[in-house]
From Swiss-Prot:
It comes from Rhodnius prolixus. The modification Phenylalanine amide is found at residue 8. The keyword Secreted applies. One of its GO terms (biological process) is neuropeptide signaling pathway. Keywords: Amidation, Neuropeptide, Secreted. It is found in: Secreted. One of its GO terms (cellular component) is extracellular region. This is Long neuropeptide F. Neuropeptide. It comes from the Eukaryota. The keyword Secreted applies.
């Protein structure tokens, strides 16, 4: 998952 992003 991208750092600092929600896990959608």
């Amino acid at each position: 998952v991208a750092a600092g992003r929600p896990r959608f």
